[in-house]
């Protein structure tokens, strides 16, 4: 290879590197707004993992750090729930019934789920709480866990839809829409804030925002 040819080759490589760098930078800028935040794909692995933690919502809870709210979210993030026979349950709850085998969640499992969702330093007092409009988790001190009672309720369930995901430094913000069960119209729009601590993201906040 002659000196002239070598020089042209080197120049070509440099130009290609500059072009590739410019394309990459431009691509990154497309997903980054002027305030430094960047949009994430709704199919992003972290986004889908975090959304799964709050996608079961069937109650209009706003203060996610409130004790009963933490238990509610923890309950829906426990995949392997046990059952218990209502005949051995000592507690009762007005308006709710317990018959045959029903869902039972140990106190320790709820506490563990709270830490997985909110952070290792978060503590919770296990008590009775609403699971959804038709079910109530009643704490049974004898069996050290909650027993899920049920009741009749004809109201439509709340449908939740993920609208957007944004990364803001050490935070990931998920914006969701609450849809009318019949017409599918947007009733409310909420934003969930997950803050990174170590390798994991933990739920810290929920607020009403504009659509």
Pin down the residues of each PLM region.
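N-terminal Sec-pathway targeting helices
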Residues: 1-18, 26
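Mature, Sec-exported extracytoplasmic domains of Gram-positive
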Residues: 29-211
């Amino acid at each position: 290879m002659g000196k002239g040819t070598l020089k042209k080759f080197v120049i070509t490589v440099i130009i290609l590197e500059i072009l590739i760098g410019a394309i990459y930078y431009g691509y990154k800028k497309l997903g980054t707004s002027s305030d430094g935040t960047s949009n994430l794909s709704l199919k992003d692995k972290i986004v889908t993992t975090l959304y799964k933690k709050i996608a079961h919502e069937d109650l209009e809870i706003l203060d996610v750090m409130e004790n009963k709210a933490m238990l509610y979210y923890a309950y829906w993030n426990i995949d392997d729930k046990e059952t218990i026979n209502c005949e051995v349950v000592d507690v009762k709850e007005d308006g709710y019934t317990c018959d045959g085998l029903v869902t039972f969640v140990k106190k320790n499992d709820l506490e563990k789920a709270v830490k997985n969702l909110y952070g290792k330093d978060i503590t919770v007092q296990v008590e009775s709480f609403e699971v959804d409009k038709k079910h109530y988790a009643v704490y049974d001190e004898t069996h050290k866990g909650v027993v899920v009672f049920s009741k009749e309720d004809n109201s439509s369930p709340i449908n939740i839809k993920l609208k957007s995901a944004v990364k803001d430094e050490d935070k990931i913000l998920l914006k969701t829409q609450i849809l009318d069960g019949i017409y599918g119209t947007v009733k409310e729009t909420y934003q969930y804030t997950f803050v990174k601590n170590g390798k994991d993201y933990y739920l810290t906040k929920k607020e009403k925002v504009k659509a």
